[in-house]
Structure formats: structure tokens, C-alpha cells
Amino acid sequence: MKYQQLENLESGWKWKYLVKKHREGELITRYIEASAAQEAVDLLLTLENEPVKVNDWIAKHMNPALVNRMKQTIRARRKRHFNAEHQHTRKKSIDLEFMVWQRLAGLAHRRGKTLSETIVQLIEDAEHKEKYANTMSSLKQDLQALLGKND
């Protein structure tokens, strides 16, 4: 396992995930009967700061259809949590207009690179072009100065 599992922290994430799903109207319990489901949800809502009891609740009451989705969500959250500790792994987001994203995604696909790798490559290409233009401008000025001195 690449990232250490922190039971207390992850129980809090699981609790938040389940409460969010419940508020969005998803069935988070394994019970078909509404009163049993509501009773289990009410119990869950009281367990926010009790990680061991949250895990027990999950084992006893959670809808089996949510198991894999919750695992994926927690795995992604764990990765983001640990990556945020180091500057070089910390992720940043930018807002792009759809057309810009579409062009960038197409270019990345054609180059066989990720969006981040494509952006870095475009920046490097622009920097190289700028450096080349500056060098040519400098050479042109030097050449004009040499030709001007010889007259």
C-alpha cells in the first residue's frame, strides 16, 4: 500500500461521505423498510466524532451497493491528503473554458501525454521560441552595428 491508512481520519471521511449521500437522497442503508433505514441513519448522525462506532455502523447497516464507491472515494481522498503534504505532489486546479479544454485535451491525446505534461511542453516551446527570437534580434542588431561601423 502506497499511502498509510489513518483509521480516525478515514472514519471521519466515511461519515461525511455517508451523510452527504443521505442528504442527496441515496439509500445508504441495507434496509428496505423506511423506519429501519431512518433509525440506522439517525444512529449514524450521532456518531460523527466516534470513529470506531462509525466503522461498526458501516459493517452492520451500510448499503452493499455503496461499498466500492465509498472505497474509491476514500482511496482518492487519502491520495490527495498525502500528496498535499509535499509541494511537488500538491495538485492545483485551473478553470478553462470548454473549448480551450477540448483543444488541450485533443493535443494531449495526439501527443500521448497527460494534460499537465502537455501544458508544460507548450510552456517550454513558448520559452524556447522567445529565447530564439531574442537571440535572432540580438544577432540582427550586432550585424547592423558591424555593417554600420564599416561604412
Swiss-Prot record:
Keyword set includes DNA-binding: yes
Main location: cytoplasm
Residues annotated as transmembrane: none
Keywords carried by this UniProt record: Cell cycle, Cell division, Cytoplasm, DNA-binding
The organism's place on the tree of life at top rank: Bacteria
GO molecular function list: sequence-specific DNA binding
GO cellular component: cytoplasm
Gene Ontology terms: biological process: cell division; regulation of DNA-templated transcription
Subcellular locations according to the entry: Cytoplasm
Classification via Pfam families: MatP, MatP_C
Gene3D superfamilies: MatP, N-terminal domain, Met repressor-like
Similarity comment: Belongs to the MatP family.
Function statement: Required for spatial organization of the terminus region of the chromosome (Ter macrodomain) during the cell cycle. Prevents early segregation of duplicated Ter macrodomains during cell division. Binds specifically to matS, which is a 13 bp signature motif repeated within the Ter macrodomain.
Assembly behavior: Homodimer.
HAMAP family, per the entry: MatP
Annotated protein name in UniProt: Macrodomain Ter protein
Lineage: Bacteria, Pseudomonadati, Pseudomonadota, Gammaproteobacteria, Enterobacterales
